[in-house]
Swiss-Prot record:
Gene3D superfamilies: 1.10.260.130, alpha/beta hydrolase. The active site is at residues 124, 271, 305. This is Secreted triacylglycerol lipase LIP6. It comes from Malassezia furfur. Keywords: Disulfide bond, Glycoprotein, Hydrolase, Lipid degradation, Lipid metabolism, Secreted, Virulence. Secreted lipase that hydrolyzes acylglycerol lipids such as triacylglycerols and consequently releases free fatty acid. Can hydrolyze 4-nitrophenyl palmitate to release 4-nitrophenol and palmitoic acid. Due to an absence of fatty acid synthase genes in Malassezia species, secretory lipases are essential for the yeast to generate free fatty acids from degradation of sebum and assimilate them as lipid sources for growth. Plays important roles not only in lipid metabolism but also in the immune response of host cells and pathogenesis. The lineage of its organism: Eukaryota, Fungi, Dikarya, Basidiomycota, Ustilaginomycotina. The gene is LIP6. It catalyses: a triacylglycerol + H2O = a diacylglycerol + a fatty acid + H(+); a monoacylglycerol + H2O = glycerol + a fatty acid + H(+); a diacylglycerol + H2O = a monoacylglycerol + a fatty acid + H(+). Glycans are attached at residue 157.
Length: 385
């Protein structure tokens, strides 16, 4: 594969083959890692016997994977952050995801064909990869028979995302994002390193050696864009070396990076982690450039970032099924508003009540309304640097 600058590189993808496998279709599942530690890569954490401690957020992602595998689809799970564990670097994630698809299609033991249809899906950090897979597929993966791209809670603009995260409960994502972006850009890393304060150096070192939950508990309410972490950090996002990089991490900004297969985007109106309007703007810009985009706004006031992922598992599954079946898809930009994605006739028709019960149990027991249980857990167990 290659880095975001097209330099030669290597990575891994993990392939899951169900017993009832349909050998003519492939799902490219971009799970969120949202961290920079080497042990956070899915190719390691998913393996039996890995030393990685149980991570409840991975369990959330397994709900969709379980449904996809039960439907008989082969699944490929690329380590799209690459060898430098670069969280937040969209173009790199897109290229490595596309090369993961190519490698999987070329893996003869699977009996897939080069033109086997592929559907890509990702949420949150995985939506960074899904969005950039969609954006770069026409140019970098034109040989791939892409049928569609699903993405939810999409960090479509890294500048806006960093500003929303900074100094908030989920500011650890900003720590991991700044670290990942710096390690993917040698010039930025050389510029940033001598400007880090002692606290900033500790934060970068921690982010490079720990995964999502540990970082969340270590760095809530941290001001990364400040003198606290970086000398001159108050103006970090105004520095030319930073703005020149981040301007290339905006979905929909360039007409040459427009998806040609259908795009399904979903986002909670009250998402407390990822900016809603940045994702909406990306979908609108893609459509202005010729893409077909269905943007779903989840309006129920108690849906937070985590709950929005879970309640849309059935809709993502339907999108995958419909793309493989070549069903019709709205042309241009279509905006739908949904109160409760679980309350739909199609969920009832396809007898998904067991899945709905699983989702509701997780939301009630582990997440809570408006992600309250998660937020309280972070506050209660925070270990400040």
């Amino acid at each position: 594969t290659g880095t975001h600058e097209s330099d030669p590189a290597v990575t891994a993808t993990t392939v899951l083959v169900p017993y009832n496998a349909k050998r003519d279709k492939l799902v490219n599942a971009l799970t969120y890692v949202d961290a920079d530690g080497s042990e956070c890569a899915l190719s390691y954490t998913i393996r039996k016997g890995s030393n990685f401690p149980g991570d409840i957020v991975e369990d959330y992602q397994l709900l969709l994977l379980q449904q996809v595998l039960e439907a008989g689809y082969i699944v490929t799970l690329p380590d799209y952050e690459g060898k430098n564990r670069a969280f937040g670097v969209g173009p790199l994630a897109g290229r490595q995801s596309l090369d993961g698809i190519k490698a999987t299609l070329n893996f003869d033991r699977l009996n897939l064909k080069a033109n086997s249809p592929v559907v890509t899906t990702g949420y949150s950090g995985g939506a960074i990869a899904s969005g950039w897979t969609a954006a770069l597929q026409p140019s970098y993966g034109s040989s791939i028979n892409a049928k569609g791209f699903a993405m939810g809670g999409t960090p479509a603009n890294m500048t806006g995302t960093l500003l929303k995260l900074d100094n908030g409960l989920f500011s650890a994502f900003a720590v991991a994002g700044v670290t990942g972006i710096a390690y993917a850009n040698d010039d930025l890393l050389a510029w940033l390193t001598p400007r880090l304060t002692a606290k900033g150096r500790r934060a970068v070192e921690f982010a490079r050696t720990h995964c999502l939950v540990s970082t969340l508990l270590r760095y809530p309410f941290s001001r990364v864009v400040s003198e606290d972490f970086i000398r001159g950090g108050t103006h970090l996002l105004e520095e030319p070396i930073v703005t020149n990089i981040l301007k290339d991490y905006v979905m929909g900004a360039k007409k040459s990076q427009t998806p040609t297969a259908p795009v399904y985007m979903y986002h909670g109106r009250n998402d407390e982690v990822i900016p809603y309007h940045d994702a909406l703007k990306a979908g609108q810009m893609w459509a202005e450039h010729g893409a077909d985009v269905l943007f779903q706004t989840d309006t129920f006031p108690l849906l937070g970032h985590a709950t929005t992922e879970l309640v849309n598992v059935p809709n993502v599954l339907f999108f995958i099924q419909d793309r493989f079946a070549d069903k019709s898809f709205p042309k241009g930009f279509r905006h739908e508003y949904i109160n409760n994605p679980l309350d739909s006739a199609r969920v009832r028709e396809q007898a998904l009540q067991t899945l709905v019960d699983q989702i509701q149990n997780i939301v009630g027991d582990q997440i809570g309304p408006n992600d309250r249980a998660i937020r309280e857990h972070i506050r209660a167990h925070a270990r400040h640097a």
